[in-house]
Regions:
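Bacterial flagellar/type III secretion structural subunits and associated motility module proteins
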Residues: 1, 9-10, 17-20, 24-27, ...
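Amphipathic alpha-helical polymerization modules
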Residues: 1-148, 160, 166-173, 274, ...
Length: 750
């Protein structure tokens, strides 16, 4: 190889530039502390460093988010703890109010304190931190509760990111706080009529008032009710073997809803010598109790009221109603004549009761126990006796029946909805079978019905409209048809099908199948009549199809009705009708199953005759709820405050509000409410611990990732200095060599 000056020069320049580049790179490493400045310098180092940088940023974001979430959970826990303390204080005050020594003035003072405690609970529920409301769900900018406990947030949790693809909730929605059901609680219901020993005339001798127990006999409950003039002797006619009377049995009607959601009706004869414990065992059997298995507990409280407890936790379907009818003579003489005539004919007093009930249920009554023929005339041994019926109520409510009269104990769901301001609402929650969730507008009636089918089910809808008109509407759920008398020609009937939009056309209708009818559709129908926006001619379906003109007419009528009247399912699954243009309303609504007043027909025996009950109940003179899985904290507290003001120890059928469970019921319910909030505090504590653990773990991970990143990208100063010295030495040697070679000439070799 020929070595020329040009080659030497090229090699010298190349070596010099390489050395300078190495020196520059090492200088950059020493000044910046990292191995590379650009991705092309070392692709593997760059990729690893970028990945670790991303992980560090993610961990930093998680740390910041969990710090913020921790602050929110801490504030939420403090608010919940304070709420539990307030509920405990509330219970102490109610216990104090329940003392017999309190005057009305002292109860009013206690009620004011309870009102302040309730207001404090609402204020805690409206706690905000840094402009965010703790219990508003995901709508943290909106105040969640008003003073009445109405909720304006949502049911959503807020989640904090705790890692790649992982989240953790860190709030309790206000819905859960004030309304969510507790699956570990049982439903407990009660009558509100106290059973007393009526062998004495308690109007004349109120000091002899004595509440009955399970050991008491049925004849003690009827007492002077066997005759109209209260002339019976409490000892001779009831107790002494040689003189006690052979009183007629009582017909007891019971209806209700079992724990599994099915309904029933029954009729049975109760003998005068039967104990109330016998009657309660019979009631338990109607709900499904057997000698080896109980599904409900039927008992009597200290005020002589029957209480029924569902033994399965989380169930929310249990319901009860009962009324009894006993043949009543004018006086003791007539009663003895009836007894003697029965003996002469060779019949029992059970036969006498059956004859009385057969006449009471005959024309024009047609089997409706809410409107019995009374008095009735029956024949015994050829003699005619005019006999009255003594009614024994189990439950009383200050409602109005569908005839416009005040309800009595025989009325069940033939009542108008309750009214509050510009809203009327049913008092029976529609509960989905299986899930125990409240029905919404989209819920199908078939998901709630007590039976297995809607075949033969007809609803009676009575409406006194916003415009002052009255409508008597029949909703046939089997045929999906609504019919009513023509307001302009009552002898003619107008009808239209229950329909929904035809998905194929979008501008015509399809008849909704029986099992697909929703509460929203029923509510729309109610709205039409409440707002006086009804079809004036019959609408016919053709092979299940509704043409465009008829469909458009119905849709426009519904739209017009919704401008003045809102009908929907409220937060407790009840049908609610609101008059939008008024602070009060003259609208009245009644909705009931057409078969609700019909019971098994006589003759009756001492063994219950049982048949299926109605598929639906929307508003009813039914049992009172002492406790249930669902809560409604503010409304519950309002009811308790009212009980304190009225001085009601227990539910009282004669009080201003007979459906209030009283202070004893309040104390039992308060234990549930406090436990409900405590469990949510525990849940929040679990959220806090999870987030705190993530926060701590993130801090450690950040250190570890930073250490790994340092190993990947950070320069080793010792190694860099050695490389610098070596490079400098090599560079200097290169320069020296280049200089020496450049100075050489041919003369050096001559």
């Amino acid at each position: 190889m020929r070595i020329t000056n040009k080659l030497n020069f090229t090699n010298s320049i190349s070596t010099s530039m390489g050395a300078q580049s190495s020196l520059y790179q090492i200088s950059q490493q020493l000044s910046s502390g990292i191995k590379i400045q650009n991705s092309y310098e070392d692709a593997s180092v760059y990729i690893d460093n970028t990945r670790l940088e991303y992980e560090l940023k993610t961990l930093e974001q998680v740390k910041q988010a969990t710090n913020s979430a921790k602050e929110m959970t801490q504030n939420s826990m403090k608010a919940l703890q304070d709420m539990v303390k307030l509920l405990e204080d509330f219970k102490v005050k109610v216990t104090q109010a329940a003392s017999d020594s309190n005057s009305q003035t002292s109860r009013e003072a206690i009620a004011k304190e309870l009102e302040r405690i309730k207001e404090s609970i609402v204020q805690l529920a409206n706690t905000s931190v840094n402009g965010q409301y703790l219990f508003a769900g995901s709508q943290v900018a909106n105040k969640p509760f008003d003073s009445n406990g109405n909720y304006y947030g949502d049911k959503n949790n807020i989640n904090v990111v705790t890692g790649a693809g992982t989240e953790s909730p860190y709030n309790i929605p206000g819905w859960d706080l004030f309304f969510k059901a507790d699956g570990d609680y049982k439903k407990q219901i009660s009558t509100n009529v106290s059973f007393t020993d009526n062998r004495w005339d308690l109007n004349k001798d109120p000091d002899k008032t004595k509440y009955l127990t399970g050991d008491s006999k049925w004849q003690q409950l009827i007492g002077q009710g066997y005759v109209k003039d209260n002339s019976l002797d409490a000892d001779k006619d009831f107790e002494y073997d040689d003189s006690k009377l052979d009183f007629p049995p009582t017909t007891l009607y019971v209806q209700g809803t079992k724990p599994d959601g099915t309904s029933f009706k029954s009729a049975v004869l109760v003998k005068p010598e039967d104990t109330l414990e016998d009657v309660m065992e019979n009631i338990g059997a109607l709900y499904g109790n057997t000698p080896n298995n109980k599904v409900v507990e039927v008992s009597m409280n200290d005020s002589g009221q029957i209480q029924i407890t569902d033994l399965k936790q989380g169930n929310n379907k249990l319901d009860f109603h009962a009324v009894a009818f006993t043949p009543q003579a004018d006086d003791k003489t007539e009663l003895n004549n009836i007894i003697q005539a029965a003996q002469d004919e060779g019949i029992t007093m059970e036969d006498v009761t059956n004859r009385v009930m057969t006449a009471a249920l005959g024309n024009p009554n047609n089997g409706d126990i809410t409107n019995l023929n009374n008095p009735v005339t029956i024949q015994i041994n050829g003699q005619n006796f005019e006999i009255d019926l003594k009614q024994t109520d189990f439950i009383k409510s200050k409602m109005t029946d569908t005839d416009g009269n005040a309800t009595n104990g025989a009325d069940y769901d033939n009542v108008y909805f309750e009214k509050n301001g510009n809203t009327v609402y049913g008092n029976v929650s529609q509960v989905i079978k299986g899930s125990n969730a409240y029905a919404t507008d989209s819920t199908k009636l078939s998901e709630v019905m007590a039976g297995d089918s809607l075949n033969g089910t007809t609803l009676n809808l009575k409406v006194n409209s916003k415009g002052g008109n009255s409508y008597d509407v029949t909703i046939n759920l089997q045929t999906s048809t609504v019919s009513y008398p023509d307001p302009n020609n009552p002898g003619q009937t107008i009808s239209f099908p229950i329909m929904h939009t035809n998905p194929a056309t979008g501008n015509s209708g399809v008849v909704t199948g029986s099992n697909d009818i929703t509460y929203g559709q029923i509510n729309d129908i109610i709205g039409l009549f409440a707002a006086d926006k009804i079809p004036t001619t019959t609408i016919q379906a053709n092979n299940g199809q509704i043409n465009n003109a008829d469909y458009t007419q119905i849709q426009q009528l519904m739209k017009d009705s919704q401008a003045t009247v809102d009908v929907s399912m409220d937060y407790k699954g009840r049908i609610s009708v609101t008059d939008k243009l008024s602070s009060g309303t003259n609208i009245e609504i009644s909705l009931s199953d057409s078969q609700s007043g019909q019971f098994p027909a006589p003759p009756f025996t001492t063994t219950s005759i049982v048949q299926n009950g109605p598929n639906f109940s929307f508003s009813a003179n039914n049992s009172l709820t002492i406790d249930e899985p669902n809560v409604d904290i503010i409304k519950d507290l309002d009811s308790m405050i009212d009980a304190v003001l009225k001085g009601n120890m227990r539910a009282d059928s004669e009080s201003e509000n007979p459906r209030n469970t009283g202070m004893q019921g309040a104390l039992e319910r308060l234990d549930h409410l406090a436990d409900h909030v405590s469990k949510l505090n525990t849940t929040m504590g679990a959220y806090h611990n999870t987030i705190e653990g993530v926060n701590t773990r993130t801090s450690f991970l950040s250190v570890n990732v930073q250490s790994i990143k340092s190993n990947v990208i950070d320069v080793d100063y010792g190694e860099a200095m050695m490389n610098l010295m070596q490079t400098q030495l090599a560079y200097q040697a290169s320069l020296k060599a280049s200089t020496t070679i450049a100075q050489l000439s041919l003369l050096n070799y001559m």
